[in-house]
């Protein structure tokens, strides 16, 4: 059967142009369908806010078009279907039927599907931005047909299909962007480790980061501050030391080591005579992020971890995203029993009253009792943030002389201590070493960092030691202590001749603790 239109005529040439236009239009619709629909709304918003300059421009042009995804999908598919259905009709006019079928399949497959989709997959953002005005015209032309269909799809499938990554997927996504993954990412090992640690910190509680109470260095309330005690504190190298009353688990407060600088060791002043601070108590089920937020308030950088004996075991609850979360009916304030927190009636008025004192009273130059004050001036709240306003924390002082020894509920068993450094180490996923730490790998006993020698003790201790004679202090060791300097320090072999005023563990920590366990060298000093 011969073709209806003779070759090489004007009509023949017009049909050829129409065929080429149909193939190009079908290919453009197929490429835009794959390229634009593969760009999620979340991805475009990320590019608009934090992409490269050119990507921001391209994403800004595409986003209004892609916003109604079902309408765009229907428009592109309708245009593609019309072009592919019309192509065989025009081919059949200029070539035999068998050749029309062959050419139609070949042209549609190669130039209408494979090539445009390959190009738009690679350069979808750029091509989509260039063709955005043309797509807007198509949306208007095909609106009467595509709009009803898109509404049906919205009703059946819902609007928008933007998918956010779950926590586990986000961690894997970050690891893939690390330079060690070999996938072209430029994130360093430290960056990926910290990001992963920040994501994992949500699922960790105080029990995961605390130091067991048996490994915590602490002092008894009636401990005399003699040479032996001061040497022990100095060799431990911590900035804060918990203080207990009779039982090591009955921790009532803490003492700042810097407050002992002026102590005369020859007078053997009892520890209860020194200025001590209250210590917060946290539940072992309290999330680390909540603990970190409490530490940032400045009341204390160390807390006692307790276990509620009356609390029944609760099974983990699996949420929709697959993450196991603990059922916890207690609020954060109930879990964090901050004994050094300001009373409610005194604390809640700080915002308005401080503003009144720092601005209103400053203008008048008068104090609360009406007396004139010299040098008073206007002070801005911005210069003194609320979280720094009570840095002195006078209400955190523990007055042993005028108040009874703090007592705590019998159903709360102290199981450990936790410091800000413990939380930061969980965030960094690395141990933090300081000048006084000696870390020994608990698996192969390889020393990593040596403890400072006894010769490096403060000169005041050395001078007192040189003036004394006839006695030798026993070997001093430390348990895992509380403070900012070394929160995960494990004990070395304790001295057999230690006074009962200084607590000492009787067993070596198991391998279930941190893989890098801190130790301290035994130090002996002649008195």
Curated annotation (Swiss-Prot):
Extracellular side: 1-15, 92-93, 148-527
Residue ranges of every copy of the CBS domain listed in the record: 210-271, 274-334, 366-435
Composition bias type Basic and acidic residues, residue spans: 358-369, 518-527
Any one Gene Ontology cellular component term annotated for this protein: plasma membrane
Cytoplasmic side: 37-70, 115-126
Biased composition (Low complexity): 464-501
Regions crossing the membrane: 16-36, 71-91, 94-114, 127-147
Glycosylation sites: 475
Primary residence: membrane
Subcellular location: Membrane
InterPro entries the UniProt entry points to: ACDP, CBS_dom_sf, CNNM, Ion_transp-like_CBS
An individual GO BP term: magnesium ion homeostasis
Domain CNNM transmembrane stretches: 8-191
Polar residues bias: start-end ranges: 502-515
Keyword field: CBS domain, Glycoprotein, Membrane, Phosphoprotein, Repeat, Transmembrane, Transmembrane helix
Name assigned to this protein: DUF21 domain-containing protein At1g47330
Organism the protein comes from: Arabidopsis thaliana (Mouse-ear cress)
């Amino acid at each position: 059967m011969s073709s209806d239109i003779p070759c090489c005529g004007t009509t023949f040439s017009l049909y050829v142009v129409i065929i080429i236009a149909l193939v190009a239009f079908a290919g453009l619709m197929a490429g835009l369908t794959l390229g634009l629909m593969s760009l999620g709304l979340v991805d475009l918003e990320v590019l608009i806010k934090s992409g490269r300059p050119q990507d921001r421009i391209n994403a800004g042009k595409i986003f209004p078009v892609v916003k109604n995804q079902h309408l765009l999908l229907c428009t592109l598919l309708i245009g593609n279907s019309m072009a592919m259905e019309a192509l065989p009709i025009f081919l059949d006019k200029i070539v035999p039927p068998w050749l029309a079928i062959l050419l139609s399949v070949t042209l549609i497959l190669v130039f209408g599907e494979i090539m445009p989709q390959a190009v738009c997959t690679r350069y979808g953002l750029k091509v989509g931005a260039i063709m955005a005005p043309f797509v807007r015209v198509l949306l208007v032309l095909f609106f009467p047909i595509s709009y009803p269909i898109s509404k049906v799809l919205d009703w059946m499938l819902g609007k928008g299909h933007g998918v956010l990554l779950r926590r586990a997927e986000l961690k894997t996504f970050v690891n893939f962007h690390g330079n060690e993954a070999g996938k072209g990412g430029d994130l360093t090992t430290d960056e990926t480790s910290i990001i992963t640690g920040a994501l994992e910190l949500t699922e960790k509680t105080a029990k995961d980061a605390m130091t067991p109470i048996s490994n915590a260095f602490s002092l008894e309330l009636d401990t005399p501050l003699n040479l032996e005690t001061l040497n022990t504190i100095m060799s431990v190298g911590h900035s804060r030391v918990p203080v207990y009353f009779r039982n090591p688990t009955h921790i009532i407060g803490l003492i700042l080591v810097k407050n002992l600088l002026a102590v005369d060791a020859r007078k053997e002043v009892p520890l209860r005579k020194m200025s001590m601070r209250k210590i917060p108590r946290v539940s072992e089920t309290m999330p680390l992020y909540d603990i970190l937020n409490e530490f940032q308030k400045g009341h204390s950088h160390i807390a006692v971890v307790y276990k509620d004996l009356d609390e029944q075991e609760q099974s983990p609850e699996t949420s929709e995203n697959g993450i196991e979360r603990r059922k916890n009916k207690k609020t954060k304030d109930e879990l964090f029993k901050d004994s050094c927190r300001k009373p409610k009636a005194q604390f809640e008025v700080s915002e308005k009253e401080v503003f009144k004192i720092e601005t209103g009273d400053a203008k008048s130059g008068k104090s609360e009792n009406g007396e004139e004050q010299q040098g008073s001036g206007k002070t801005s709240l911005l210069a003194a943030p609320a979280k720094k306003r009570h840095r002195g924390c006078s209400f955190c002082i523990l007055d042993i002389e005028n108040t009874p020894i703090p007592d705590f509920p019998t159903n709360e068993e102290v199981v450990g201590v936790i410091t800000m450094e413990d939380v930061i180490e969980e965030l960094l996923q690395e141990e933090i070493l300081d000048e006084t730490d000696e870390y020994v790998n608990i698996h192969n006993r390889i020393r990593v960092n040596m403890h400072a020698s006894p010769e490096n003790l403060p000169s005041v201790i050395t001078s007192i030691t040189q003036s004394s004679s006839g006695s030798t202090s026993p070997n001093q060791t430390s348990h895992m202590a509380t403070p900012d300097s070394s929160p995960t320090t494990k004990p070395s072999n304790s001295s057999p001749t230690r006074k009962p005023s200084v607590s000492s563990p009787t067993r070596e920590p198991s391998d279930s603790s941190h893989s890098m366990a801190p130790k301290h060298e035994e130090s002996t000093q002649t008195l």
